[in-house]
């Protein structure tokens, strides 16, 4: 991991998904790339967002404090900022974007 490097990651979150897992990359209607992620937690009192942050931190092997929800707190489509990660780390963890 590279120190001082930040990556913006767009995620479409599915709460109550049965398990915590990434399901690959997709494009929205406007052609913007996002990562599909499901978590077992319900969308109640921030539980699904917390599970998403924990899942990303564990998968990318970074501290939870390095994952920040920048936008989309109550929406399914979220923008996160990942500190100390470069795009190659994301591609290794979740596969290359389509």
Swiss-Prot record:
Pfam families: DUF167
Listed SUPFAM superfamilies: YggU-like
Domain of life: Bacteria
Family stated for the protein in its record: Belongs to the UPF0235 family.
Protein name from the UniProt record: UPF0235 protein CCNA_03737
Organism annotation: Caulobacter vibrioides (strain NA1000 / CB15N) (Caulobacter crescentus)
């Amino acid at each position: 991991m590279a120190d001082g490097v930040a990556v913006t990651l767009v995620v479409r979150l599915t709460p109550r998904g049965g398990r915590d897992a990434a399901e690959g990359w997709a494009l929205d209607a406007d052609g913007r790339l996002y990562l599909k992620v499901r978590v077992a937690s319900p969308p109640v009192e921030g539980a699904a967002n917390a599970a998403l942050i924990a899942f990303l931190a564990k998968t990318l092997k970074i501290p939870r404090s390095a994952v920040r929800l920048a936008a989309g707190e109550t929406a399914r489509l979220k923008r996160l900022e990942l500190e100390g990660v470069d795009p190659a780390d994301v591609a290794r963890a979740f596969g290359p974007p389509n």
